[in-house]
Amino acid sequence: NLDQSLAEQRNARYLHMIEIYKHAGFEPYLSYAESIDDIKLSLNNHLPDLVLCGIDHLPENGCNISHNVHAWFEEHNVNYIGSDYKVIELALSKGLLKQKWQTYGIRTPVFGLIREKPEECNEDIESLLSLNAFPYILKPENLGNSRGIDENSIVWNEAELRKALDKMRLQFGGVILAEHYLGASADFREITCAMIEGSSGMLFMPAEVSLVEPKRFHIITTRDKDKNGTIANPLDADTAASFLPFAERVFAIAGVRDYSRGDFILADGEFWAIEINGQPMIPDQWFGSAALFAGLSEEKYLVGIVASGYRRLKAEGRLAQV
């Protein structure tokens, strides 16, 4: 069973992370949560000084409510590591984040949002056709980590667009993002960039990401990530030197803090911002690889993430002592 195998692998990674934190002098505990009620119980049982949570939203038992977990933490005075809830919502909305980048002159592929109601959907499709930016790649607007995309998400004409849109609607519903697909460019390269906020500012750690088994057109799916179908390599020095000022602006405009990871593309001789993961589920293969290329061991980057949150909270007067 693939799902069970993945769950076992993830659990092993979490337990390994806990051992790293113990070795570094923390008193950590691992807790799984499927609802806000689970978090309440865990907080009451352990009374933590700091919380690192990889889940952005959770339901409340008996209520038709989905809570932004970081917003809930703030409402209940829980000290947490990571970006504030407004930034999490912005990062989860690909369209809003791309609009903000455009406002500040950040290069991001031409895109359009396709709403759900039939009359609005047709209007949005017409807008996309008028942009004439084929090929497009379709993505659920509010899902990250490559969820919801596969090779059939790349469309080259109106007929393929409508077919792929109908399929994605059945599976996910909601607003769909269609953006110009850059993978057909001859110089295409995908870059991931991890960020940890240190005592002297943000440390940006880029890596080039590719497929173990190349496809006709480059697209990394959730399955590729889960089945170790990707490989990360250091970014060459010249490309990194050109890339880092662009990445710094992209992260700053997104408003992230403590730690984050961004996805970028190099195509047609330019860097393009694709999306930001405002709440990476640590430990993360790409984050760890990028950190390693920057000279940080697994222990150093994991402890560095906790240190970033601790440092910020102490400066805010939220933590009294080490």
PLM regions with names:
Residues 1-14:
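Glycine- and acidic-residue-enriched helix-capping/strand-helix junction motifs
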Residues 1, 56-60, 141-143:
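Short glycine-rich anion-binding loops that position phosphate/pyrophosphate groups of nucleotides
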Residues 236-322:
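ATP-dependent carboxylate activation and anion-phosphoryl transfer catalytic cores
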